[in-house]
């Protein structure tokens, strides 16, 4: 009787073993079936091999300077610029592996030990997601499924995708891909943006404790936000450092030392409207959109069929030099702050009841304000929302809180309360500026400053704005005369009243221009001396002899696109031109008569480095080498004995105007410089075009409206408003020898039959002009 239970126990054990294997096999079969179904797409869409090869990740377009630095980006929601594994520091990779997946380099996408641990301890001792699984979730299964069953299916899909990723990519590629994809919030998409935004540096320059902060954010970037939860982020950083020590990536001593460090966040937000070269970047936006319209995208499966500058991760290689751009922006800011201060001083309500406008009656002032009001964003929005003109006008007289531009603030902004109409008048009191700098031999634009502050002044005065050129147009007249009439810089003409009769050259009535000071010396002036001092009577004689038509033809060949009437008055600079055109044109003189179209973009690549666009230079032979050199020689006279002499002398340091607005004076340049100042009617525009052998730079300063200007020529001339910006910019350029800005003589042609070596008497007269220029407070600079 005692043996019966043993038989029963044996039978029960056999049944247990049988059912165990049945259940095990069934479970294994179900698991395999689930994986197969997931792999075949029956549990929801799975990425194809093509999508795994070319995932549609939104990438920002990066704008790269000629010296390899990032000028800015174009993006919508994802400010992401990928980096390769080689660009990641070892401490960042080590922190990632130690914290997120310690056996990363040992498994094939799924960590069996980690998965078993997570099941046994229900996740209490850490999750089981590998880096590859986390990447698959970021790329293909972002949405968290509801319910237990849904979550299980999603997890299975992540496992399948992770295995596929491991088969198609190296471990290093997956790490880079993961870090490039993760959203670190605060507009920091991917490791490069995160590194730049939180620490102001490239990923390769991250210190160990900084890498630990970013890796700590991978657990939950919203929770571990360095800008809002510093203590929580600090604790998380120290946890990451502890993991690194646990897995021998750093020593215990180093861990303890790093954990003692305070948080050192250097928040540097990135925005389309902030940073360096904002106006240039906005120009590029239009350039790229035009390029996209003409170049269809060869779309792969699942991709867009049109290039998108905000999503496709293009790399745009530009000609702008980061250092020179910085020098240019600093020069504009430094001078415009001082110039604006004086302009405010001269336009107080007590001194000018119609400020910022001069010499306008109330009706003319109202017309300007009315036009500005109707062109404002506020008017357009309210009109689009169905508001009546009466309602809109009423809103412009209601005080409201606003943030406006302010030179006196470190952020160039201040909060205030004023009516929208008052804000329009306030902004019109600011003088505007534009500057472009170009290598004449290549056409490469090295610096581009379209205004004071793009956020508040979005009109680009380099290429959008066209203003009267004043005396900076005169070199085109001189070039035509030397080219067509075979004159030389040493030929002389009298400074006396000169009239072109009615009916000649299309004149409806006699044209008898005056010199800027209203006087005629009666003396003979060489062309060099006449251009240096902007003698209008000599220029009038030249355009009469050569005719307006050849002058216009040369200007067009030099790249001027705007309308130029074929009438004599153009000789004194009445045409409206922009800085972009003027720099390109003047570059021809330095480049031995060959016009090179200014270029801003040399190459465009896709996210994989495939070249999509490469610039082909556009050139045109316009002038002979002799004529071009003669023109450069003429304009050297401007800085030797004319309106540009303040670049060289230091004798006026105690004069009031020099103290107030000639920023940075004395400059004391000793190297060869060719240039031309320009001032238009009523001092509405001030120009300076400056040239050295390998750099041509144009500067314009003026009000938004021509009625916004200085009252006197002393302050309102090109030599006061624009020339100091050029001088400050070049001083900074010369201080950086790596830029290689030339201080040499302008190259002379091998054969030169045009006389440029004027007599000793002529040179003495130039020196006399220079002395008179200093004593008379640059009265000879009047160059309408």
Identify what each model region corresponds to:
Residues 33, 68, 96, 135, ...:
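Residue-level preference for non-acidic, small/hydrophobic
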Residues 158, 162, 166, 218-236, ...:
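Active-site loop and adjoining helix of the penicillin-binding protein/serine DD-peptidase-beta-lactamase fold
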Residues 322-338, 371-439, 444, 448, ...:
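A penicillin-recognizing enzyme superfamily signal
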Residues 38, 98-111, 122-127, 165-171, ...:
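Bacterial peptidoglycan biogenesis and beta-lactam-recognition machinery
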Residues 121-145, 204, 268-280, 487-551, ...:
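Conserved catalytic neighborhood of penicillin-recognizing serine enzymes
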């Amino acid at each position: 009787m005692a043996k019966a239970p043993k038989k029963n126990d044996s039978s029960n054990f056999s049944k247990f073993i049988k059912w165990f294997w049945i259940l095990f096999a069934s479970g294994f079969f179900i698991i395999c079936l689930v994986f197969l179904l997931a792999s075949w797409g029956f549990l929801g869409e799975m990425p194809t091999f093509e999508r795994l090869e070319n995932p549609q990740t939104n990438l920002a377009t990066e704008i790269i300077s000629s010296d390899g630095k990032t000028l800015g980006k174009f993006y919508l929601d994802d400010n992401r610029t990928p980096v390769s594994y080689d660009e990641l520091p070892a401490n960042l990779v080590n922190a990632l592996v130690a914290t997120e997946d310690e056996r990363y380099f040992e498994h094939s996408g799924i960590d069996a030990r980690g998965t078993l641990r997570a099941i046994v301890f229900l996740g209490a001792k850490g999750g089981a997601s590998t880096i590859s699984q986390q990447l698959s979730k970021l790329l293909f299964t972002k949405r968290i499924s509801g319910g237990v069953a849904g979550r299980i299916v999603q997890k299975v899909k992540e496992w399948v995708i992770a295995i596929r990723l491991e088969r198609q990519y190296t471990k290093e590629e997956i790490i880079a891909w993961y870090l490039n994809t993760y959203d670190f919030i605060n507009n920091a998409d991917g490791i490069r943006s995160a590194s730049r935004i939180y620490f102001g540096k490239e990923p390769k320059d991250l210190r160990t404790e900084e890498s630990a902060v970013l890796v700590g954010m991978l657990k939950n970037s919203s929770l571990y936000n360095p800008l809002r939860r510093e203590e929580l982020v600090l604790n998380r950083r120290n946890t990451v450092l502890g993991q690194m020590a646990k897995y021998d990536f750093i020593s215990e001593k180093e861990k303890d030392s790093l954990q003692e460090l305070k948080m050192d966040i250097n928040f540097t937000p990135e925005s389309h409207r902030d940073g360096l070269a904002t106006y240039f970047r906005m120009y590029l936006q239009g350039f790229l959109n035009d390029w996209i319209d003409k170049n269809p995208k060869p779309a792969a499966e699942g991709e867009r069929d049109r290039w998108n500058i905000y999503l496709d991760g293009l790399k745009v290689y530009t000609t702008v030099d980061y250092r020179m751009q910085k020098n240019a922006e600093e020069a504009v800011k430094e001078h415009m702050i001082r110039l604006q201060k004086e302009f405010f001083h001269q336009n107080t309500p007590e001194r000018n009841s119609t400020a910022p406008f001069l010499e306008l009656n109330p009706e003319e002032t109202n017309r300007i304000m009315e036009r500005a009001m109707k062109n404002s964003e506020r008017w357009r929005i309210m009109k689009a929302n169905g508001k009546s003109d009466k309602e809109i006008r009423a809103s412009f007289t209601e005080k409201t809180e606003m943030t406006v531009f302010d030179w006196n603030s470190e952020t160039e902004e201040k909060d205030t309360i004023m009516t929208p109409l008052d804000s329009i008048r306030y902004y019109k009191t600011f003088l505007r500026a534009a500057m472009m700098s170009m290598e004449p031999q290549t056409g490469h634009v090295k610096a581009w400053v379209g205004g004071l502050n793009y956020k508040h002044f979005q009109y680009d005065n380099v290429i959008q704005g066209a203003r009267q050129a004043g005396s900076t147009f005169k070199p085109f007249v001189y070039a035509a005369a030397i080219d067509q009439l075979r004159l030389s810089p040493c030929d002389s003409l009298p400074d006396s009243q000169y009239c072109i009769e009615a009916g000649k050259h299309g004149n409806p009535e006699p044209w008898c221009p005056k010199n800027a000071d209203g006087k005629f010396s009666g003396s003979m002036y060489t062309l060099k001396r006449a251009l240096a001092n902007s003698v209008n009577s000599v220029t009038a004689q030249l355009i009469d002899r050569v005719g307006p038509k050849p002058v216009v033809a040369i200007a067009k060949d030099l790249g001027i696109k705007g309308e130029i009437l074929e009438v004599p008055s153009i000789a004194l600079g009445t045409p409206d031109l922009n800085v972009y055109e003027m720099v390109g044109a003047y570059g021809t003189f330095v480049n031995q008569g060959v016009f090179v179209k200014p270029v801003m973009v040399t190459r465009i690549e896709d996210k994989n480095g495939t070249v999509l666009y490469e610039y082909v230079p556009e050139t045109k032979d316009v002038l002979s080498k002799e004529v071009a050199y003669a023109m450069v020689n003429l304009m050297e006279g401007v800085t030797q004995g004319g309106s540009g002499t303040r670049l060289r002398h230091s004798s006026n340091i105690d004069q009031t105007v020099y103290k107030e607005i000639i920023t940075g004076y004395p400059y004391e340049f000793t190297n060869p410089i060719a240039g031309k100042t320009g001032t238009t009617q009523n001092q509405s525009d001030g120009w300076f075009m400056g040239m050295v052998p390998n750099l041509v730079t144009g500067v314009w300063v003026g009000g938004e409206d021509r009625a916004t200007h200085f009252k006197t020529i002393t302050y309102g001339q090109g030599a006061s408003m624009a020339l100091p910006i050029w001088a400050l910019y070049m001083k900074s350029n010369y201080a950086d020898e790596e830029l290689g800005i030339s201080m040499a003589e302008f190259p002379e042609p091998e054969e030169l039959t045009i006389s440029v070596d004027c007599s000793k008497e002529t040179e003495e007269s130039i020196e006399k002009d220079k002395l008179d220029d200093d004593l008379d407070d640059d009265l000879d600079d009047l160059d309408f």
